[in-house]
Regions:
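Conserved class I S-adenosyl-L-methionine
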Residues: 1-52, 152-177
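A short His-aromatic
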Residues: 127-131
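Class I SAM-dependent methyltransferase SAM/SAH-binding core
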Residues: 58-112
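A conserved beta-strand element that flanks and buttresses the S-adenosyl-L-methionine
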Residues: 124
């Protein structure tokens, strides 16, 4: 484990995830806002993870391998799933006995990856980078990734002022140290990787919450309208994309 102030942060994150976060109600609130974008994300993830077939792959985290790797029919040569929380590793292992993919689960600090340089062809994670010391984590990802290797990360953005307010009002759904990505983090990523960004949820947030009041099905005319408006706004007014709720990052190591 890392030493000094960073080790204290790692310990807080470990304790928070071992104890469990209160996210069920929070996630239900945003079920309608994210539904169609999660479908789009799944298609992009499926396409990008073809590059992980029969390759050495690392997940920062221990949960997403089931939906991203196993359910997409990807069979890596080796798949390592690392997490600082034993409880999260235990959750990840629950699907292992039914899986054709057999991940290696390791209790490990993502700030100090216990792998040799250039070990992996593909590194991915879902909602993990914003829990880490971002610069340190990127350095480690870059180090263990082979030249030309791929990355794939889904992360929250923290630029929208309303999103900042929501985060302040829901401390029970997050850890003390987590920090959604800002301009600085997006720019830092470009120094090490050639990237494409897929932005998710802008008008889909308020209209999705409203649709949840009137519709049980998250795929309804209001969420479809919001989804298409968001795609149009992202295309026509690029400066607005930074106000979206999430971003899916696809990249190649420089």
């Amino acid at each position: 484990m890392t030493e000094g102030p960073l080790s204290a942060r790692v310990q807080r994150e470990q304790d928070a995830f071992n104890d469990g976060l209160q996210r069920d109600g929070y996630m239900r609130l945003f079920e309608h806002t994210s539904h169609l974008f999660l479908q789009r994300r799944a298609r992009i993830v499926q396409n990008e993870l073809k590059h992980a077939q029969d390759k050495n792959v690392l997940e920062l985290g221990s949960i997403s391998w089931k939906s991203w790797i196993e359910d997409n029919g990807i069979k890596p040569r080796n798949l390592y799933c690392i997490n600082i929380s034993q409880e999260e590793i235990n959750l990840g292992k629950e699907s292992e006995h039914l899986s054709k993919v057999k991940p290696h689960f390791i209790l490990m600090d993502a700030h100090n990856l216990d792998f040799e340089d250039d070990s992996f062809d593909f590194v991915y994670g879902c909602a993990i980078l914003h829990h880490l010391d971002y610069s340190r984590a990127l350095d480690e990802i870059y180090r263990v990734l082979k030249p030309g290797g791929k990355i794939l990360f889904a992360e929250p953005l923290g630029i929208n002022p309303i999103a900042k307010l929501v985060r302040v009002m829901t401390p029970f759904a997050r850890t003390i140290d987590e920090k959604p990505l800002m301009f600085k983090e997006l720019l830092e990523l470009e120094k090490k990787f050639n990237t494409s960004h897929y932005y998710e949820e802008f008008l889909s947030v308020p209209l999705g919450v409203i649709s949840g009041i009137f519709f049980n099905n998250p795929n309804n005319w209001l969420t479809r309208l919001a989804f298409n408006l968001d795609l149009s706004l992202n295309r026509m007014f690029p400066f607005l994309r930074y106000l979206f709720r999430h971003v899916l990052i696809v990249g190649t190591r420089k």
